[in-house]
Amino acid sequence: MAALAPPVAAIRRAIRHALIELPDPGPVLVACSGGADSLALAAATAFVAPRLGRSAGLVTVDHGLQEGSAQRAAAVADWARATGLAPVEVVRVDVSGRPGGPEAAARQARYRALTEVAGGLGAAALLTGHTRDDQAETVLLALARGAGPRGLAGMPARRWLGAALLLRPLLEVSREQTRAACTALGLDPWVDPHNADPAYARARVRAEVLPALVRALGPAVVDNLARTARLVAVDTAALDEQASTALDGVRHPDGGLSVGGLAALVPAVRGRVLHAWARELGARPAALSHRHVGALEALVTGWRGQGAAHLPGGLRVLRRAGRLTAIDPGAQV
């Protein structure tokens, strides 16, 4: 018997570790585009899940952005069924007319579809193929836009996606390993031309910025950026937990927040409290920026009688009688 290729073994170990920790015995789903990362993930999951007594299926999303996308999605589905994954779902999404550009629109539509499929099938978890390289790119993009700790924490290894856990088991695996695993398994991954299109910021980081950093600072750059994300994520989780407790402590029975209570909080916690409250009010996380949180902060620590702070979705927040109070869009003040 031929020895198992090290990249294949590494990916299977990562999948096993992720699945063993799942408390819900329900099925798992792999999100697979047919690219090397998600294809290696799907192949490993098809091998590991049954050996843990767990069923595993696959969902592939056709964004309809390229000629032949429907045929490619069908080919991924056929391969998945032949590999033993079940159920297998193909979902077509429409990304036209969505705000934020094609990259953001495709991502939003994809995750909405994945959430619906996972919920409909009662999946315990949805697995995606994001790698250590993806994490490094995410950190660089966050740095470029001036993100705070939450952005620098990168992609979490797990988070809730509707009723299912979203798992990223390959964040400690390199893109080189997923490609090598596909080669070792005789798989022919699809190469997404968008990944090399300089119109997209992530593609430019992948093709130009990260290679330049590796040349200038050495090959450990990718690992170090990913490690930075892990370290920041630990601190961010602790601060978020403090903020959750603090939010309850400053909340007024009418739904507003006590200005005095907010002012007593340390800035790192206060900013998180205001961010969490804005989300409770209905501000979309993707649209909620540091500028919006800063406007809320100014109502607490920079009060000079100014008017309302404006949040995404037409929401407004006023300072009244020692409280921050939300005003419905369109309401007369």
From Swiss-Prot:
InterPro entries on file: Rossmann-like_a/b/a_fold, TilS/TtcA_N, tRNA_Ile_lys_synt, tRNA_Ile_lys_synt_N, tRNA_Ile_lys_synt_subst-bd
Gene Ontology biological process: tRNA modification
UniProt-annotated binding residues for ATP: S33, G34, G35, A36, D37, S38
Keyword terms: ATP-binding, Cytoplasm, Ligase, Nucleotide-binding, tRNA processing
Catalytic activity, as annotated: cytidine(34) in tRNA(Ile2) + L-lysine + ATP = lysidine(34) in tRNA(Ile2) + AMP + diphosphate + H(+)
GO CC terms, sorted: cytoplasm
Known EC number: 6.3.4.19
Main location: cytoplasm
Disulphides: none
Keyword Hydrolase found: no
GO molecular function: ATP binding; tRNA(Ile)-lysidine synthase activity
UniProt subcellular location: Cytoplasm
Domain comment as written in the entry: The N-terminal region contains the highly conserved SGGXDS motif, predicted to be a P-loop motif involved in ATP binding.
Family classification: Belongs to the tRNA(Ile)-lysidine synthase family.
Biological role stated in the UniProt entry: Ligates lysine onto the cytidine present at position 34 of the AUA codon-specific tRNA(Ile) that contains the anticodon CAU, in an ATP-dependent manner. Cytidine is converted to lysidine, thus changing the amino acid specificity of the tRNA from methionine to isoleucine.
Name by which UniProt lists this protein: tRNA(Ile)-lysidine synthase
Organism: Salinispora tropica (strain ATCC BAA-916 / DSM 44818 / JCM 13857 / NBRC 105044 / CNB-440)
High-level lineage: Bacteria, Bacillati, Actinomycetota, Actinomycetes, Micromonosporales
